[in-house]
Amino acid sequence: MAQVNHDIPFFTQLLRQVFTRPIKIVHAAPVGGGDIHHCYQIVLADDSHFFIKCNHARYANLLEQEHYALAALKQAGAIKVPAILGTGECEGYCYLVLEWLELSTSGDETALGRQLAQMHQHNSDRFGWAADNFIGHNAQQNAWCESWATFWREQRLLPQLMMALKNSRGRMLSKYVDDFIAASDALLEHHNPTPALLHGDFWGGNKAYLASGEPVIFDPASYYGDPETDIAFTRLFGGFGADFYTSYNYARSLLAGASTEEAIAAAQASNLPEQVVQRQVLYNIYHQLNHFNLFGEGYLSDCEQAISNVIKFTR
């Protein structure tokens, strides 16, 4: 992340582009917010608080696509997301201004599971998104597609694989590519999910809770796809408890038309169907490859093992 030097005059000018009211900043300090953008808490004299992401103007599309995804999640109305207050460019920097929320890592996981199931009820007639966006700072392709198997192959796996093969260490994956892609097609050939609104980067670091316990989600990489992909990623790095999964499975079953008894049984099931487990391994390879492409060879052995497992599933 390139160094930038932002001060109160800069943020004053930035906020004057967003608001028509007088701007008097009494506090401006960097805060944590990821490894791509510079993030700040800004406090005005009237005690208004804001969260601002900034970066060099060449990264404007990353923040524009985050804005677009947050707006879609907010419109769905299922889970709270930070309110979007403004985006634009100021003095050679792009920015995204959001409401400031006091967040905690613990809260109502039952509500999070239920609300995610409700969000996944917002559907499209095709897989994809209105624009390509980003997963981390890597490009995420989202061309509309009628077939889920085709979308997953062409828009998810192959772009990450081709990126990995350009890395001298990643070239070792080349021996798996043909068999792996064939295995992906086989696993998804008869799997026909309804395209659902997804968070797209739903790991434990992209959810939090208000003091009331209400869930909040952020940093999306949204598109319309298989809801199982969001759930799969929650299992890759952990951070979600049993209450989340029980609540999600119960609500998802009810929303799909199951009886209360059937929904309870789904929520209490101790083991996932084998096909679901296999798809979760397949779906998480996308994120494992992305982590290799972002952060390097520490993720290479995980990619190789998972790819080998997917190939074995279809033999």
Residue ranges and their predicted role:
Residues D7-R21, S124-L197, L210-S212:
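An alpha-helical support segment within catalytic cores of ATP-dependent transferases
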Residues P22, D46-F50, E214:
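Short acidic/polar mixed-charge low-complexity motifs
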Residues P22, G77, G88, H120-F127, ...:
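A general structural signal marking secondary-structure boundaries and capping sites
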Residues P22-A29:
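Conserved N-terminal boundary motif of the eukaryotic protein kinase catalytic domain
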Residues A29-T150:
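ATP-binding pocket architecture of kinase catalytic cores
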Residues Y59, A258-E261, H291-R315:
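ATP/Mg2+ or Mg2+-diphosphate-binding catalytic cores
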Residues Q141-R153, M162, H191-L197, Y209-Q288, ...:
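Active-site Asp-x-Gly
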Residues L198, W203-G204:
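Canonical protein kinase catalytic loop motif
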